[in-house]
């Protein structure tokens, strides 16, 4: 197999402006109990090098565990971790930036191989759904 075939991957990008300050978004991204309310149950700690897991709904031939490791923590700016499950080895990067009326949150999940079209489609749907849950959490004042 050629080297280029091994490294050709796709990146999913989801962006949304939230009518909330970056501090509120950052808490929702980095506090385990808040993260569980809009994303998945977890044992996350915002410490570079920390391994953690998300627990999703188990399915036939999958226990629902997403294995992760924190890569980057830049408070109020960037958060990144690996996201490994079902043969997908990817990296999730959240970037916060000032925006008119609030804070823009950009999520990039990189590492989808050409043969992982179904995983890419599932992630695209899933992250939109997760962002909707994040909006509800923030609007409810929990973060």
Label every model-predicted segment.
Residues 1-42:
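Hydrophobic ligand-binding cavity/cleft-lining segments
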Residues 9-11, 107-114:
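A short small-residue
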Residues 23, 34, 75-78, 132, ...:
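Generic structural signal for secondary-structure transition and capping sites
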Residues 40-44, 51-53, 58-104, 110-112:
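Hydrophobic-ligand binding "helix-grip"
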Residues 110-143:
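A conserved amphipathic terminal alpha-helix motif
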């Amino acid at each position: 197999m050629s080297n280029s075939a091994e490294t050709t991957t796709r990146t999913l990008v989801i962006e949304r402006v939230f009518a909330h300050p970056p501090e509120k978004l950052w808490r929702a991204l980095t506090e385990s109990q808040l993260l569980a309310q809009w994303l998945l149950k977890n044992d996350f700690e915002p410490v570079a090098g920390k391994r953690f897991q998300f627990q999703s709904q188990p399915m036939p031939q999958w226990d629902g565990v997403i294995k992760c490791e924190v890569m980057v923590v830049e408070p109020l700016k960037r958060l990144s971790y690996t996201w490994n499950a079902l043969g997908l080895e990817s990296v999730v990067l959240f970037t916060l930036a000032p925006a008119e009326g609030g804070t823009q949150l950009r999520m990039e999940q990189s590492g989808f191989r050409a043969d992982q079209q179904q995983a890419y489609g599932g992630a695209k749907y899933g992250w939109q759904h997760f962002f909707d849950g994040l909006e509800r959490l923030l609007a409810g004042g929990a973060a």
